[in-house]
């Protein structure tokens, strides 16, 4: 890991809703919900902090949001406008560094090594406020994981710094769900082992942890110690994202394989969010222990893929995992064993460039 790395994670505050409040003074101070209509099967895209005080959250059904906050003002998303503002934010970022890794339309990592990172974060926030009349929360640290963790500690309009010394104070009691890449399925698997905090994780036998999580165990251990070797990588567009595993012993345990798909879904959802992408198609790949002769390679193991297209693009781990399990449950085994299992997502779209028809209004 680089010892001279300094990273800023900038996360714009309630981005879509804040833009609407900025552009319409009558909405300022009111609970604003950007998303689908509560009169149909709409969902909340985002909401203002005034609405969040009533328990409204992103991805919540709009009807539930209306029940929690009857006085809320619902606004149809204008993704073209949000994307334009996102480009303005990115242009301001580029004044400070060219090494920018977008996570979504409203958040990004910036590599500001060799500069006064705290000063840069402060000036970046001030420029966005002065020119765009919006606020963002910044986290500053020596690695990406902790910079992202820091940006969420003083929202909205915060600036938090996590040094190595501060990390050693925070991490022992940090819930494992806060670790990079730990989604609902991984959190549940860790809890089943009695691991609830980073301190618990570091106290657990690493060899036993590897039996449950494979090479991912070592990544979790490093994160729990405050070590994240990943560099800030400028965005490169992907056509699909996937993960698969060839087993040393052919598998017949459907429940185990179903849980493995959930773990894959956690990882894919995290990667989608990292790249600011949503997926509309989920594909399960299975290679059986049945060898079929022929073809250019002289033969190969029998393989099938099964896909399902979603009504709306998603980067939610639970949704991807649920669809993957449903696909898997429909596969007929016919007495065969599983040699390889994979999960991938396709038909990727960038946040802010989604077709508005995807959102039920």
Swiss-Prot record:
Domain UmuC: 7-183
Catalytically driven reaction(s): DNA(n) + a 2'-deoxyribonucleoside 5'-triphosphate = DNA(n+1) + diphosphate
One cellular component term from this protein's GO annotations in UniProt: cytosol
Residues that hold Mg(2+) according to the record: 11, 106
Cofactor dependence: Mg(2+)
Pfam families, per the entry: IMS, IMS_C, IMS_HHH_1
GO molecular function, one term: DNA-directed DNA polymerase activity
Gene3D superfamilies, per database record: 3.30.70.270, 3.40.1170.60, 5' to 3' exonuclease, C-terminal subdomain, DNA polymerase, Y-family, little finger domain
Similarity-based family: Belongs to the DNA polymerase type-Y family.
Subunit structure: Monomer.
Record-given protein name: DNA polymerase IV
Protein encoded by which gene: dinB
